[in-house]
C-alpha cells in the first residue's frame, strides 16, 4: 500500500541538527526582530547625552517703534549634567534588557528546532518500520488469499491478514499527516522554502545531563529577572 500525504523524497534536502539550528538563528523572523530592537536601543544610548536643538525665532515688523525692524530670539535649554547621565543609564539598562531578550529568543529557538528535528527523525524511522511491516503483511495476505482459493484455510485467516494490513495503512496515513505538519513547522522555524529534512542516521536519544548551578544562573531568563 502507498500512503498519501508525504512530501516527495526527491524534493527534500538532508540537514544535520546543528546546521538546522545555525540556519534558524540566522533566518528566524522572531530572532531577527529582537536583534533589530536591541540595535535600536543601542543607538538610543547616544541620544541620552545630546543637548536639545537650539531654537531660533525671527520676527519682522513694527516691534519696538513705528519703523519696521527685525527681532531674533535664540533659545537653548541646558539641563544639569546629572540629568543626561541618568538618561544614559536608563537607556543603557534598556539596551541590556533587549540583549537578554535576544539571548532568550535564541535559547527558545534552539529548543524548538531540536524538538522538531528529533521528533521528525523519530517519525521517519517509525514510517520505515511500518512500511517494512506493510510489505510483510502484503506477502502474508497474498499467501492467505492463495490458501483460501485452494481450500487450505478458512475466511478467518484471509480476513485477519486484510485487517492487519488495513491497520498499518491507517497508521501510515496518520503518520504522514504528522510528518507534513512537522515539515511545515520546521520550515517556519528555519524561515526557508527549501524542503529540509533530518539527515539519515542523525537521530540520538535524549539523555539526562547534570545541571550545575552556574549554568542555571547564566540562563537568559534568570538574568532578565535579576535586573
Annotate each PLM feature.
Residues 2-10:
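C-terminal segment of classical bacterial N-terminal signal peptides
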Residues 9-55, 78, 86, 152-156, ...:
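Bacterial Sec-pathway N-terminal export signals of envelope proteins
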Residues 15-19, 69, 139:
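Generic alpha-helical secondary structure signal
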Residues 30-36, 49, 79-109, 131, ...:
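Sec/SRP-type N-terminal targeting helices
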Residues 54-105, 221-227:
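Small/polar-residue-enriched beta-strand and adjacent coil segments characteristic
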Residues 108-224:
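Periplasmic alpha-helical coiled-coil/stalk elements that build and connect Gram-negative outer-membrane
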Amino acid at each position: 500500500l502507498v500512503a498519501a500525504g508525504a512530501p516527495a523524497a526527491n524534493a527534500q534536502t538532508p540537514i544535520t541538527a546543528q546546521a538546522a539550528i545555525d540556519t534558524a538563528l540566522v533566518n528566524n523572523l522572531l530572532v531577527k526582530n529582537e536583534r533589530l530592537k536591541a540595535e535600536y536601543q543601542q543607538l538610543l544610548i547616544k541620544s541620552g547625552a545630546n543637548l536639545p536643538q537650539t531654537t531660533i525665532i525671527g520676527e519682522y515688523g513694527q516691534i519696538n517703534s513705528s519703523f519696521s525692524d527685525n527681532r531674533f530670539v535664540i533659545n537653548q535649554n541646558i539641563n544639569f549634567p546629572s540629568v543626561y547621565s541618568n538618561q544614559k543609564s536608563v537607556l543603557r539598562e534598556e539596551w541590556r534588557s533587549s540583549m537578554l531578550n535576544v539571548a532568550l529568543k535564541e535559547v527558545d529557538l534552539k529548543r524548538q528546532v531540536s524538538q522538531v528535528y528529533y521528533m521528525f527523525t523519530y517519525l521517519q524511522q517509525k514510517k520505515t518500520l511500518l512500511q517494512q511491516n506493510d510489505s510483510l503483511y502484503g506477502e502474508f495476505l497474498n499467501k492467505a488469499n492463495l490458501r483460501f482459493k485452494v481450500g487450505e484455510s478458512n475466511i478467518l485467516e484471509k480476513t485477519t491478514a486484510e485487517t492487519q494490513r488495513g491497520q498499518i495503512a491507517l497508521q501510515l496515513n496518520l503518520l504522514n499527516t504528522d510528518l507534513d505538519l512537522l515539515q511545515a513547522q520546521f520550515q517556519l522555524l528555519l524561515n526557508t522554502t527549501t524542503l529540509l529534512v533530518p539527515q539519515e542516521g542523525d537521530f540520538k536519544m535524549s539523555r539526562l545531563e547534570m545541571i550545575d548551578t552556574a549554568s542555571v544562573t547564566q540562563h537568559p531568563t534568570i538574568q532578565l529577572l535579576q535586573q
